[in-house]
Amino acid sequence: MPTINQLIRKGRKSKVSKSNAPALNFGYNSYKKVATNNPAPQKRGVATRVGTMTPKKPNSALRKYARVRLSNLIEVTAYIPGIGHNLQEHSVVLIRGGRVKDLPGVRYHVIRGALDTAGVEDRRQSRSKYGTKKPKK
């Protein structure tokens, strides 16, 4: 517990909040070859590797992921939600923040139905989250 004198001399420091999706906070100036402060809700990137990984205990599955080089030259691992996907190396994808709790190091999601990523086939519920068009009657 600080004394009144210590508080007068130093004051209280406000806590600095840390981003859960740090790669979305930067841009890149290709002329000056320098990172810029350009936060965005989503970023475009190119898939450099597409594969599967196994989750932490106690879960068991083959979760689909893509290693993505973003437009700001940061490389991140993004989860591909939904059943089945059409991504391969050099696909252009849009990513958003949002971690996958049982995959260590995965802090981003690929947005389905945007750019080269197709929506989930035959999806009836929660379609907007998976980029699926409204089915014909």
UniProtKB/Swiss-Prot annotation:
Keyword Nucleotide-binding among UniProt keywords: no
A molecular function (GO) term: structural constituent of ribosome
Top-level taxonomic group: Bacteria
The keyword RNA-binding is assigned to this record: yes
Gene3D superfamilies: Nucleic acid-binding proteins
CDD domains to which the protein is assigned, alphabetical: Ribosomal_S12
Cellular component per GO, a single term: small ribosomal subunit
Pfam family, one: Ribosom_S12_S23
UniProt record, GO biological process: translation
Keywords of the record: Ribonucleoprotein, Ribosomal protein, RNA-binding, rRNA-binding, tRNA-binding
Role according to the record: With S4 and S5 plays an important role in translational accuracy. Interacts with and stabilizes bases of the 16S rRNA that are involved in tRNA selection in the A site and with the mRNA backbone. Located at the interface of the 30S and 50S subunits, it traverses the body of the 30S subunit contacting proteins on the other side and probably holding the rRNA structure together. The combined cluster of proteins S8, S12 and S17 appears to hold together the shoulder and platform of the 30S subunit.
Subunit structure: Part of the 30S ribosomal subunit. Contacts proteins S8 and S17. May interact with IF1 in the 30S initiation complex.
Family per record: Belongs to the universal ribosomal protein uS12 family.
Matches recorded under PANTHER family: 30S RIBOSOMAL PROTEIN S12 FAMILY MEMBER (PTHR11652)
UniProt-recorded name of the protein: Small ribosomal subunit protein uS12
